[in-house]
C-alpha cells in the first residue's frame, strides 16, 4: 500500500449559495411524519426479497410500531406487489389511520395498473418519481431538462385524472425528483413547481414533495442547505410537505436527515435499522430514538426492541449489527472498567434518588425504554475493572461487596479472562464468586454451633469444627460470636488470626432473607483475604465467613 489513493479522480461537491441560512439556529421540537419504505426500497435491496407471508408480518409490525404511512411496493411493476396490496385491501388489513403508498413511473399503463391495485383503499399516496440528475439525464436518458419536466407533468396529469375517477379513495400525490442531490437546484425547483401547478394542492390538501438523497454525495449540512433553498424558493410552500429520503453512502444519512428537518422538512422516509440499496436508507429507529433522547415524543414505539429485531431479521434475512444504534446487542454494553464503574454508580444513584430525569454515565437513554435489561449492560473481559463484577453480583445475586473485596475479586476475574482469552458471562462470574469466596471448606468447616450472650461484651461459643476431616468440639469466650470463634481457633490450632474488615447485609428484603457476611482475615501475619458467609442466621453467616476467609488465607500462604 505504497503511495496515495487516486483522489484526483473526484471533485468536491459544490456548496449552496445561501446568504441567510436559518437552519443552524433552530432546534428540533417535534417529530416528523414517518413513512416506512421497508416493503419497497428495503425489500428490493434484499438478496432474497420477502414473500407474501413475510411482507404481511412486516406490515403488521410497522403498523404496531406506529407508522401511519407505509410504502407497500411497486404494484405496476411487480405482480407480487400488486397482489400484496390487493390482499391488504380485500382482507381489510389496513387500519383507518394508516395510508398505504405505492411507487410508480410516469407511464400511462403503469399509472393505470397502480390505480387498479389501490381500488377500494380509503386513502392512498401515489408516489410519482422522475430521475432528474444531470448525470442520469446525460448518461441514462439523453433528455433535456424540459423533456424531463414534460414527462413529470404528463404523469401528474394522468394521476390527477385517475384520482378524479376514483372518488371513493382519497389520493395524495407524492413527487420525487429522483437523485435530487445530483440535480441542479434551479431545475429541481422548476420541475417541482411544474408538478405543483398541475396538481393544484392547497394547505388543507397538500402534496408531498420528496427530495431524496438517492445517492449521498455531500456532507449533511449541504443537504440541509438544499432543503432550505427549495423551501425559500417554492411559490406556495404552505401547500407542500417536504419529505426526506436519504441514503447512507457516506455514512451520514441520519445526520443529513436531522439537519434537513431543521431546514424545514416535515416528513421522513426510511427503514428499520437502515436496510436499503447499497449502504442502506435512513435508519428511522435511530432518528426516532434520537428525538426520544431529547424528550420529544417520536410517535413510534420501540419499547419491545428485541421482538422488533427478531421479526425484522426473520422477514428480511438481514441481521442487525451488534453496534447498530439503539438496537445492536452491544450498544448498551461496557467492557471498560472505568465505564462499568461509572454506570454502576449512576444506576445506583438513579434508583436511590428515584430520579425522574435519566442521567447515567455512558448510557444516553434508559435501556428499559427499549425492552432491554441492565444486566447485559456490563460485560466482563480482560479490560474490565472491579465495578463491572460488583454490578453483576449486585444485580444477579443481591450481593454488595465492600470496595476492598471488589479489588480482590477483580484479580480472580482478571486471571481467568487472561487464561481463557474471552469475555465471561454473568453466570460464569457468579460461579467464580461462589467457588472462590463462599464454597471454601478446606481445611476448616463449621458444624453445629451454640452461643449465648453472658453479658453485653461477653459471649460464650461452642462449635464443632472439622479440620482436614477431623471434627473437634471447640469452645471459647469473646466479645461476640466471631471473636469467640477466632479465640477458639487460635488456642486449639496455634494460629494467629487478625480480623481486618467485616460487613454484613441482608441479601433480599423480608424476614427470611439470607445474611451476607464479608470478613477479611490474615493468618500468622500473612496477606489479608476475604471470605463470605451466607445463612438465614446472621451469626452463623458471620462464622462461616470467618472460616472461609481463614481457608483462603491458608491456601494463599501455600502458593
UniProtKB/Swiss-Prot annotation:
<keyword id="KW-0963">Cytoplasm</keyword>
<feature type="binding site">
    <location>
        <position position="247"/>
    </location>
    <ligand>
        <name>Mg(2+)</name>
    </ligand>
</feature>
<feature type="domain" description="Pyruvate carboxyltransferase">
    <location>
        <begin position="32"/>
        <end position="306"/>
    </location>
</feature>
<keyword id="KW-0479">Metal-binding</keyword>
<dbReference type="InterPro" id="IPR013785">
    <property type="entry name" value="Aldolase_TIM"/>
</dbReference>
<dbReference type="Pfam" id="PF00682">
    <property type="entry name" value="HMGL-like"/>
</dbReference>
<keyword id="KW-0432">Leucine biosynthesis</keyword>
<comment type="function">
    <text>Catalyzes the condensation of the acetyl group of acetyl-CoA with 3-methyl-2-oxobutanoate (2-ketoisovalerate) to form 3-carboxy-3-hydroxy-4-methylpentanoate (2-isopropylmalate).</text>
</comment>
<dbReference type="InterPro" id="IPR054692">
    <property type="entry name" value="LeuA-like_post-cat"/>
</dbReference>
<keyword id="KW-0460">Magnesium</keyword>
<dbReference type="InterPro" id="IPR002034">
    <property type="entry name" value="AIPM/Hcit_synth_CS"/>
</dbReference>
<protein>
    <recommendedName>
        <fullName>2-isopropylmalate synthase</fullName>
        <ecNumber>2.3.3.13</ecNumber>
    </recommendedName>
</protein>
<dbReference type="InterPro" id="IPR013709">
    <property type="entry name" value="2-isopropylmalate_synth_dimer"/>
</dbReference>
<feature type="binding site">
    <location>
        <position position="281"/>
    </location>
    <ligand>
        <name>Mg(2+)</name>
    </ligand>
</feature>
<dbReference type="GO" id="GO:0003852">
    <property type="term" value="F:2-isopropylmalate synthase activity"/>
</dbReference>
<dbReference type="InterPro" id="IPR039371">
    <property type="entry name" value="LeuA_N_DRE-TIM"/>
</dbReference>
<comment type="similarity">
    <text>Belongs to the alpha-IPM synthase/homocitrate synthase family. LeuA type 2 subfamily.</text>
</comment>
<dbReference type="InterPro" id="IPR036230">
    <property type="entry name" value="LeuA_allosteric_dom_sf"/>
</dbReference>
<dbReference type="GO" id="GO:0009098">
    <property type="term" value="P:L-leucine biosynthetic process"/>
</dbReference>
<feature type="binding site">
    <location>
        <position position="41"/>
    </location>
    <ligand>
        <name>Mg(2+)</name>
    </ligand>
</feature>
<comment type="pathway">
    <text>Amino-acid biosynthesis; L-leucine biosynthesis; L-leucine from 3-methyl-2-oxobutanoate: step 1/4.</text>
</comment>
<feature type="binding site">
    <location>
        <position position="245"/>
    </location>
    <ligand>
        <name>Mg(2+)</name>
    </ligand>
</feature>
<dbReference type="GO" id="GO:0000287">
    <property type="term" value="F:magnesium ion binding"/>
</dbReference>
<comment type="subunit">
    <text>Homodimer.</text>
</comment>
<keyword id="KW-0100">Branched-chain amino acid biosynthesis</keyword>
<dbReference type="Pfam" id="PF08502">
    <property type="entry name" value="LeuA_dimer"/>
</dbReference>
<keyword id="KW-0028">Amino-acid biosynthesis</keyword>
<dbReference type="Pfam" id="PF22615">
    <property type="entry name" value="IPMS_D2"/>
</dbReference>
<dbReference type="InterPro" id="IPR000891">
    <property type="entry name" value="PYR_CT"/>
</dbReference>
<dbReference type="InterPro" id="IPR005668">
    <property type="entry name" value="IPM_Synthase"/>
</dbReference>
<dbReference type="GO" id="GO:0003985">
    <property type="term" value="F:acetyl-CoA C-acetyltransferase activity"/>
</dbReference>
<keyword id="KW-0808">Transferase</keyword>
<feature type="region of interest" description="Regulatory domain">
    <location>
        <begin position="440"/>
        <end position="559"/>
    </location>
</feature>
<dbReference type="GO" id="GO:0005737">
    <property type="term" value="C:cytoplasm"/>
</dbReference>
